């Protein structure tokens, strides 16, 4: 997972924006279609760049039998009552009305995460903007009758 995140960070960083990182050390193994996850992360970063004020952070980690990656920004954020609707195609938050966009970015992210048996959450970032976190299952195999994460 971190290798895919690193590729997106490298591609999306540049003279227009710098991306802070908080990637868990070491490998995070998940079953994924790398191009799809790249598309999801890129959509999340573009969303953060479009609606934020310049600060973007991409992080990853694991918790129990799940891995996660997230993108945070320092924009106006999304009101809690609007969050559940943002994953629907063509729906945009109130703070997005003054900027260009189709309202498809988070719907595409939701579809990709769903296709990976994952879960998508919206919250507030450490700087008051939007935090989008995707949870993906960590594969488990049986070894000597015991379950073990790979």
Please provide the spans of the model-predicted regions:
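Conserved micro-motifs of the catalytic ATP-binding
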Residues: 29-32
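A residue-level detector for a conserved hydrophobic packing site
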Residues: 37-38
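Conserved glycine-rich
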Residues: 54, 117-118
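Short beta-strand/loop element within the Bergerat-fold HATPase_c
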Residues: 55-65
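Acidic ATP/Mg2+-coordinating residue in the GHKL
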Residues: 73
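Short conserved segment of the HATPase_c
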Residues: 78-90
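Short alpha-helical Gxxx[C/S/T] motif in the catalytic ATP-binding
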Residues: 105, 109
């Amino acid at each position: 997972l971190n290798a895919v995140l690193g590729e997106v960070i490298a591609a999306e960083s540049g003279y227009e924006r710098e991306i802070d990182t908080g990637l868990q050390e070491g490998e995070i193994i998940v079953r994924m279609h790398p191009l799809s996850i790249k598309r999801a992360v890129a959509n999340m970063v573009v969303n953060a760049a479009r609606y934020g004020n310049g600060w973007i952070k991409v992080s990853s980690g694991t918790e129990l039998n799940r891995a996660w990656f997230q993108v945070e920004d320092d924009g106006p954020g999304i009101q809690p009552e609007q969050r559940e609707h943002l994953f629907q195609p063509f729906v945009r938050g109130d703070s997005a009305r003054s900027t260009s966009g189709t309202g498809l970015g988070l719907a595409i992210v939701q579809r990709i995460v769903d296709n990976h048996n994952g879960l998508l959450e919206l919250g507030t970032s450490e700087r008051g903007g939007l935090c989008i976190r995707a949870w993906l299952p960590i594969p488990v195999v049986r070894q000597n009758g015991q379950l073990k994460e790979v």
